């Protein structure tokens, strides 16, 4: 509801209005966006399909020790990305910063490296929007750019507002 959204603090948000891309469309547990709290607090929404979702889910459990709770390929994508950040050594940096009550500082190189790792592991066509807690928004497509992704903005009294969507009609609706 609009009145509920207006009371939320912060200047970033991530939403999804499309049915789940894999699994059961009737299962509310598969509604996007998906969230993991480790290593940083990452939220993901995506449009697309993974062709290796099942095998990647098994691989994530056996090798990466990550349990996927649903049949959604979105949750698989999220965990592949989160694990890549963790493997890049970012998790140890996070623990050090938490101990000193400092904000997490991820480098652009670390984030892009995690996206590259995801692109190497995940097969299929996808457009992804993510929010990393205390860092910001991230958007990317599969390595072949099969799924569309649009970037829009509008100037307001509070500054520039940015929007990422898998179809331009979502942005055009803002005026």
Language model segments and positions:
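Conserved short alpha-helical segments that host acidic/polar catalytic motifs at enzyme active sites
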Residues: 1-175
């Amino acid at each position: 509801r609009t009145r509920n959204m207006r009371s939320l603090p912060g200047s970033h948000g991530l939403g999804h209005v499309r049915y789940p891309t894999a699994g059961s469309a009737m299962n509310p547990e598969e509604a996007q966006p998906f969230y993991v709290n480790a290593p940083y607090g990452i939220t993901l929404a995506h449009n697309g399909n993974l062709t290796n979702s099942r095998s990647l889910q098994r691989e994530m459990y056996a090798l990466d020790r990550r349990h996927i709770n649903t049949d959604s390929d979105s949750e698989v994508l999220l965990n592949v990305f989160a694990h890549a950040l963790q493997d890049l050594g970012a998790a140890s940096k996070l623990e050090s910063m938490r101990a000193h009550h400092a904000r997490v500082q991820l480098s652009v190189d670390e984030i892009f490296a995690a996206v590259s790792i995801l692109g190497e592991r995940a097969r299929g066509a996808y457009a992804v929007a993510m929010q990393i807690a205390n860092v910001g928004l991230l958007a990317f497509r599969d390595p072949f750019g099969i799924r569309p992704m649009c970037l829009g903005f509008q100037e307001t009294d509070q500054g520039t507002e940015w929007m990422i969507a898998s179809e331009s009609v979502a942005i055009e609706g803002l005026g």
